[in-house]
Amino acid sequence: MAAVDSFYLLYREIARSCNCYMEALALVGAWYTARKSITVICDFYSLIRLHFIPRLGSRADLIKQYGRWAVVSGATDGIGKAYAEELASRGLNIILISRNEEKLQVVAKDIADTYKVETDIIVADFSSGREIYLPIREALKDKDVGILVNNVGVFYPYPQYFTQLSEDKLWDIINVNIAAASLMVHVVLPGMVERKKGAIVTISSGSCCKPTPQLAAFSASKAYLDHFSRALQYEYASKGIFVQSLIPFYVATSMTAPSNFLHRCSWLVPSPKVYAHHAVSTLGISKRTTGYWSHSIQFLFAQYMPEWLWVWGANILNRSLRKEALSCTA
């Protein structure tokens, strides 16, 4: 009986001494929960503020904000073409840059006829390296470029492991995905700084959120573009330059053409026209955005999920996309 009493008294003493620690842990838990709840609420408020509220008011005057001419690289199809058309619908004159002269002329004529704006073309193969930038610089020297859209990029033929890529494809990723955006900014930014206004939009990718297996070089190149854009914004915001990192997830372009699965999810995988219409409405509002409401939801999930879960999901999706692409070419 004495032993039971002694145990009970010991238990009471231990419980009393632990009370303060339990209260401290409860406070830490409450603080963590409140912080996470506020973060989630703020994220969803940002989603509404960015993708829905601007659509209720009048469209921003991009010519007044930035200038009359816009330069769009990779502009003959996909997001680049749709973005150029959306800018033209707002009255901007468009300079289209791509490697296929015939396609450039067709797109330039369509834009000029449809939107009654001036268009110009520059034929340039960004995979050729540094020699193409002198002619581009000469062609743009007399233009007051207000908006630069760095869209040109190359993708894998389909998701695959790094050693399965050819050396030529790796150089294309370096020259087109990384060097092109860097050098195009170097060409147009001095004029923007001199005029104290301008906008630079660089199109990255949702694969830059976390390391993405089976797209290693591509996702790394897009992570470079994201960091490059964010750093430029810090450097040049005080000089009147708006720099936006645009981070789309899947859009229904030639890159996703082999996948029937992706094209069935239209609310997750918008057409280039729908995507560009939403993305342009974020210009001047958000420095870093996916450009489309459902992509922003995907981005939030990507930010919150642990890296191992992202990698697991990416492996499953990319294996499926590779299998589907190979079955189409067989």
UniProtKB/Swiss-Prot annotation:
The keyword Hydrolase does not apply. Residues 2-82 are annotated as: Required for mitochondria translocation. Highly expressed in testis and ovary. Also detected in thyroid, spinal cord, adrenal gland, heart, placenta, skeletal muscle, small intestine, colon, spleen, prostate and pancreas. It comes from Homo sapiens. This is Inactive hydroxysteroid dehydrogenase-like protein 1. Its main location: mitochondrion. Belongs to the short-chain dehydrogenases/reductases (SDR) family. 17-beta-HSD 3 subfamily. The modification N-acetylalanine is found at A2. It comes from the Eukaryota. Interacts with STYXL1.
